[in-house]
Amino acid sequence: MLQGYKNYIGLGYHANIEDSLGFARIGITGAYTPTGNLPGNQQGHAEITGEYLGWRAAFSYNRSDFYDIFGPTKKSRKGYAAKVGYDNTIIWDEPRQLDLKFDLAYYDKIDTLPNAQNVETTFTRLVQGQVGLHYTDVRRSIGAVDDEKGISWSLVAKGSQAQGQLIPQIWGTFNLGIPTPIPHSSIWLRSAAGGANGERNNSLANFYFGGFGNNYVDDGPIQRYRDFNTLPGFEIDEVSGSNFFRQMVEWTLPPIVFESVGMPSIHLTWLRPALFATKLWTDVANSERRQNYGNVGGQADLRFSVLHWYDMTLSVGYAVGFQGTKRAGTEWMISLKIM
């Protein structure tokens, strides 16, 4: 198999091991990037992941990722990483669900922040712990292709320790969906706010924003523009702040459902358009450093089925970014979700 590491392509092998009931699974990946543009200690890659009931763990060395080949979002990172986490479901009364998630991670010999691909570090060793509550109670009517009403929220606390300093962060999100009189169409208000305690010039004491977040070929969520740390119309990690408030208004338009477009081996299922506008304030607690950003844009998602079994989604998006009242840039996004 092929693996992406930073801007290079390597060769590797992946194996999955599972029990017959699917309670436990282990994934093992090994790869090598044959290029003279990387130091010798970055050409080898290894990763082991494991899951058992609510537990999950991972260990990696120079982590590589297949979808990094396509970009622009990169998951590959230099150095060692050891992670362990646990998900505990407190409420499971569908559609209501409340989860409590714990995560602990240790990094060594790193050169980039684990959660910000374009932010270099001044340290090589990092310990992080995170705990969060995640609640969802969203609903959709018969024939809908997306959630149409309800609420969801999250509250997360995180601590990062490097070079003898402990930097705490806390953030939360709140989403409210209101149906419109138009069938299968809703207005969503998506809010987020957070803050960190640390020096503004400390990379760990900042939140980073930018980009749609989708790769040209991907396996992740389709509508990543909804995530609080994305900001279509800007480069990935281009915007930062030690505290922030973000407000998005999204209008999900009625989907177009295809009844007989295609052939048995490949046919179109539906087309879902959406429009959005976002306002982001950073460093809101400091009047001298306070900045405001915004965007307007849209995304259309075309779902199609291959061989009656594989559902894929082709997404196209466009956004214009603003800093204050001035136009700051534009961004086109095209992404094919294959898994």
Identify the role of each PLM range:
Residues 7-11, 22-26, 51-57, 78-80, ...:
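Outer-envelope beta-barrel architecture signal
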Residues 24-28, 257-264, 284-287, 308-312:
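Extended hydrophobic-aromatic, low-complexity segments
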Residues 315:
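Conserved, short, structured surface segments that act as functional micro-motifs
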